[in-house]
Amino acid sequence: MATAALLRSIRRREVVSSPFSAYRCLSSSGKASLNSSYLGQNFRSFSRAFSSKPAGNDVIGIDLGTTNSCVAVMEGKNPKVIENAEGARTTPSVVAFNTKGELLVGTPAKRQAVTNPTNTVSGTKRLIGRKFDDPQTQKEMKMVPYKIVRAPNGDAWVEANGQQYSPSQIGAFILTKMKETAEAYLGKSVTKAVVTVPAYFNDAQRQATKDAGRIAGLDVERIINEPTAAALSYGMTNKEGLIAVFDLGGGTFDVSVLEISNGVFEVKATNGDTFLGGEDFDNALLDFLVNEFKTTEGIDLAKDRLALQRLREAAEKAKIELSSTSQTEINLPFITADASGAKHFNITLTRSRFETLVNHLIERTRDPCKNCLKDAGISAKEVDEVLLVGGMTRVPKVQSIVAEIFGKSPSKGVNPDEAVAMGAALQGGILRGDVKELLLLDVTPLSLGIETLGGVFTRLITRNTTIPTKKSQVFSTAADNQTQVGIRVLQGEREMATDNKLLGEFDLVGIPPSPRGVPQIEVTFDIDANGIVTVSAKDKTTGKVQQITIRSSGGLSEDDIQKMVREAELHAQKDKERKELIDTKNTADTTIYSIEKSLGEYREKIPSEIAKEIEDAVADLRSASSGDDLNEIKAKIEAANKAVSKIGEHMSGGSGGGSAPGGGSEGGSDQAPEAEYEEVKK
């Protein structure tokens, strides 16, 4: 028995007639009126800014990518991408732990990957929200140089330097880097962000991404889909019409169809593959190179982690070069060695050969595109513009496939690497109230429902329903005198419950004993603007209600998250202490140089005991600065400066007949300035 009781559904035809307050979660109030997420105010109480800078009210936009990440902020009515400390506009999504236990993020981490492959973690976005037993996880384990392990809750975690980390934790390290990049630019602390995710991410993956933000000390104001964010950045200049966004990034593929009209961005449909991206292209090329070397030299490089990492980086570089050239050389001297001596790897790779190797991957983008157009109820001819997003869309073969699918050349109107972050910053501007003329109506990518009698998946909310939304349906018991009902919440498109993703389960107890089919149990699904689901079950006879915000059967517990927040703060504190130590050592070097220069100039004019005292102080400072005791180095800097000040005291006393060095007397040419030094604040 399943009598539908529809509470509310936001559809296209309601956009005009519905009061604007119905979409308040996207308006200037910045508060989600339909938001029933479990996070709510609790996340704000635990979010901390790991910075001593003054608090700011900016909402930054972060594209947390599989391969690269990017951060942007609103300047007036326009989004601006912020360069990182290395001067780049994107940051590699790579985290490493070196032998000293130091945490490296971004370019420094990627740079040392060849010599430290097992402790350098990348591409963890593909693991976020996934189980260890997931077939995709098992596939990924064979491709990465680091260890993927089973967490106590059954999730897929990674291991580095003997310690286990959740993908959310690794994501948090990258988000922290993005946060610090924004803070350095703005000159104030940042605690709020809009973070993007692939449109085809399920609820567990969205929750895990939000957890990553929380661990990084960020209150994630909104999770938005990457293609939607790209469309926002494209459409902010009053563009209108039907837009298809083809987003092929480092690890995931999404395609969305949107209609832009009078500042309203309405997502009509979305589709994709969360395990298709640049990493798969790299791996296809890597397999080819390994096999080529095995054929010519009889050595399997797949068994040599260091050689494999060098080859992986060469494959990625070759892939990038072949987007703009017809052929490239891969030269890796001393890649390995055997009894006959050192072996070198040298091969010429043509674009046509590369395209042959990855053609099966490119072809996998066809079906999601066709299904997306079908769900949107339009033909390819009706699409006005096709936007390319993600670094992999620079591959000429990908562009030709897009042109073939949609019947038109794709637009180059957005930067494939930066459009998503810019759109996220725009959404932040909408939430803050700085951007009032844009309204975003997104959709849920997958159907949501429960398991009913016979193991059937009964949908309550179908895919591509505009969010936020809330729907209910009345069910009954399957047996006589049944006093409790188990509610299994699922997400997917298969007809049988076991073939779909189990998001969570709970029990409604205390149902009065009755014949089967008599009790009235109302199940309600509520999806907020982040795409996060709350499910409740109500016995209409007794009024008893059981409600949960969906957490995957794995996922991070509250204790896990708080522990990781503390660890993130500890890492931030260690980084701060390390920077202070380096700055103080630099000050010590400058002090030594200046004192020795002054001593050289005035040695003949001061008593030998003063010169000896200064030399001893410099020797002590040099010895201290070779160690890591911050307080000792500071004390020795102070002692050295006190010793060198005696030159000035002696000279001002008239012993050398000159005026006081560094003093205010007129005409003194032989002045001995004290050593330059910079006081490092604690």
UniProtKB/Swiss-Prot annotation:
Q: Provide the protein's localization.
A: Mitochondrion
In residue numbers, the region (Disordered) covers 646-682
One of the entry's Gene Ontology molecular-function terms is:
ATP binding
Q: What is the lineage of its organism?
A: Eukaryota, Viridiplantae, Streptophyta, Embryophyta, Tracheophyta
Gene name of the record: HSP70-10
Query: Quick check: keyword Transit peptide in the entry?
Result: yes
Family listed: Belongs to the heat shock protein 70 (TC 1.A.33) family. DnaK subfamily.
Transit peptide residue numbers = 1-50
* Chain's role: Chaperone involved in the maturation of iron-sulfur [Fe-S] cluster-containing proteins. Has a low intrinsic ATPase activity which is markedly stimulated by HSCB and ISU1. In cooperation with other chaperones, Hsp70s are key components that facilitate folding of de novo synthesized proteins, assist translocation of precursor proteins into organelles, and are responsible for degradation of damaged protein under stress conditions.
Record keyword Lyase present = no
Sequence ranges of Gly residues compositional bias: 651-667
Q: What induces or represses its expression, per the UniProt entry?
A: By heat shock.
Official protein name in the record: Heat shock 70 kDa protein 10, mitochondrial
| Annotated coiled-coil segments of the chain | none
Question: Which Gene Ontology terms describe the biological processes this protein takes part in?
Answer: response to heat; response to virus
